[in-house]
Amino acid sequence: MDLKNRTVLVTGAGVRLGQAIAVSLGQRGMKVALHYHQSMEGAKKTLDLMGGDIKQHGCFQADLRQVSKIELLIQHIEEKLGQIDVLINNAADFFPTPLGEVSESEWDHLISLNLKAPFFLSQLVGTSMLKQGQGKIVNIADVAAERPWPQFLPYCASKAGLVSLTKGLAKALAPAVQVNAVAPGTMLPPHQISSFSQDLAIEKSLLKKMGRPDDIARAVTYFLENDFVTGTILPVDGGRMLAS
C-alpha cells in the first residue's frame, strides 16, 4: 500500500508506542487520526512531533470501552479525514493483578479496553474497508500472550485473545483486507514494573537490551507496506521468546 495521503486511525496515540507509531506514519505522508482517552496533552504533543501540515491530522477523544463511543469516534474521523484506510489497535492498559486479588471491575476494564475495543473497531472499520476493496489492520499484541506473567493474568488473557482475533479477522476480511499483529517484548518500561523485573526481562532476551517504541513503529510500517502478509504475529522482543 502506498501510504501517502491515506487515512490511519491510531488508538492510544498520546503516549509511548502509540505516539511513536503515529509520528512515524505522519512523517510518511499519512493523514493521522490521533485517538486518546485522557491523554489530551500527549495527543497534542504527538501532533507537534509529526511536523508538516498539522491540518491534515486530528485529535479525537473517546472511551473505547463503550461501543457507542467507538461508533461516534469513527463518524467524527470520517467527517474530518475521510474513510479510514488503516487501523492501528494500540490502546491498552497494563497493571499488576495478582491471583486471588483480581476484582471484577479490573477484569472487565482490561478485557474491554484490550480486546473488546479492538474487535468492535475492527468490525466497524473492517466492513467499511471491504466495501472500499482494500485496507490494513495492525493490532499491538504482546509476547505475554504466549508467555503469560503470573502477576498480570487478565492482561495476558486479553492479549492472547487479541492474537486469536488477529488470525480470525485475517480470514474473515480476506482477500481485500490484511490483518496482522506486532507482539512487543520489553519496551521502555511503564512505571508499574520494578527495576528487578526490567533487568530480569533483559537478561532473558538474546539481545540483552530493551526495545524502543521506534522498533514497534518500524514493524507496523512493514505490515502496511507489504501487501502479501496477513494473519501474522510478529514478535519484536529481542529474541526473548526464542531464549525462554
Where are these regions (language model features)?
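Active-site loop-to-helix junction immediately N-terminal to the catalytic Tyr of the SDR YXXXK motif
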Residues: 102, 144, 148-156, 168
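Conserved glycine-rich cofactor-binding loop
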Residues: 7, 14-15
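C-terminal substrate-recognition "lid" of short-chain dehydrogenase/reductases
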Residues: 134, 212-236, 241
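Active-site helix of classical SDR
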Residues: 122, 158, 166
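Alpha-helical segment proximal to the catalytic Tyr-Lys
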Residues: 127, 170-175
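Conserved Rossmann-fold SDR core element
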Residues: 25, 83, 163, 173-187, ...
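Substrate-binding pocket helix/loop in short-chain dehydrogenase/reductase
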Residues: 98-99, 106-111, 137, 201
